């Protein structure tokens, strides 16, 4: 979003305590319009969910599309061994929840742009939500494709409420497995002591209903095992398989964080710099309701073996 450079600061306004908070709240010295005024210039989008509902409606005909952008090979960077396993495992986990999974291996920036724009242009009216997963080498705010760098926000910008109306008011979930810098987490040792009938129209921010889950905190390395896959994606698959239909998404992601933080540690004894290092995922949520994935009873892959995957957390690790 861009700020209007013609705006000028307004005099300081005193806040008055009142039950109607929306009428008294003001931005920090910038001109604004009340939310109800926006309906004069913006066509309202009809949603089959009450503005006061605590959960997203996840009972539509389709669960939705899940895009997986799996960057494995690069022109001038190491091959991301283990990422194919991540993509395969994640496809199985998401298919079990009813998603239409589409995998793109080693896409160029041009291909990524085309895929995102064409998916945004689809009619998602009968879909519950959208998922986009990107797995690659990365830097802070940037991801590497086969041929170039691209900004991470390119993943969600085509799907904001003002650009993809059929997904407005629905959860749009983004999972990013990539480094976000070169810092290493040494870790800290812990010693344990003992249905509504309201027919109202309302507006929502364009960036509402988005969640971005990063594999690591900004500025830090993200870890991947060449044989068993990346820590973050494997932990995500395990939690989706075990609790994908019972826990709300943010609770589930908290347990993904716990798995990565506690169950994993790098093992590179011949290189002290990279040995015995830790990782913690980072979640940015603009969700406005709880996200659940109830059983659709329609997925063709419901019969996939739901067994848990073994993890080898103390084997040679490589940085994503």
Where in this protein do the model-derived segments appear?
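Cysteine endopeptidase catalytic domains of the caspase/legumain-like
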Residues: 1-320
């Amino acid at each position: 979003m861009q700020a209007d450079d013609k705006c000028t600061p307004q005099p300081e306004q005193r806040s008055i305590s009142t039950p109607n908070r929306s009428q008294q709240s003001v931005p920090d010295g910038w001109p604004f319009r009340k939310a109800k005024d926006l309906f004069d210039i913006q066509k309202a989008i009809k949603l089959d969910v009450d503005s006061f509902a605590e959960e997203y409606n996840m009972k539509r005909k389709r669960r939705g599309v899940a895009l997986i952008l799996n960057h494995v090979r690069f022109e001038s960077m190491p091959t991301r061994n283990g990422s194919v396993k991540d993509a395969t495992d994640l496809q199985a986990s998401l298919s079990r929840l009813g998603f239409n999974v589409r995998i793109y291996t080693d896409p160029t920036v041009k291909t990524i742009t085309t895929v995102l724009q064409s998916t945004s242009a689809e009619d998602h009216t009968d879909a519950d939500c959208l998922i986009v997963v990107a797995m690659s080498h990365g830097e802070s705010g940037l991801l590497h494709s086969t041929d170039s760098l691209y900004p991470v926000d390119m993943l969600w910008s085509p799907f904001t409420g003002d650009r993809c109306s059929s997904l407005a008011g629905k959860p749009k979930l983004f999972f990013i497995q990539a480094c976000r810098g070169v810092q290493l987490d040494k870790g800290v040792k812990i010693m344990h002591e003992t249905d509504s009938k309201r027919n109202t129209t309302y507006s929502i921010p364009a960036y509402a209903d988005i969640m971005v889950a990063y594999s690591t905190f900004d500025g830090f390395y993200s870890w991947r095992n060449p044989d068993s896959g990346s820590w973050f994606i494997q932990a995500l698959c395990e939690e989706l398989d075990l609790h994908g239909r019972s826990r709300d998404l943010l609770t589930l992601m908290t347990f993904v964080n716990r798995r990565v933080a506690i169950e994993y540690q790098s093992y590179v004894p011949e290189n002290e710099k990279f040995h015995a290092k830790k990782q913690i995922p980072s979640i940015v949520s603009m969700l406005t309701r709880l996200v659940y994935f109830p059983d659709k009873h329609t997925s063709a892959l419901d019969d996939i073996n739901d067994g848990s995957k073994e993890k080898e957390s103390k084997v040679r690790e490589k940085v994503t």
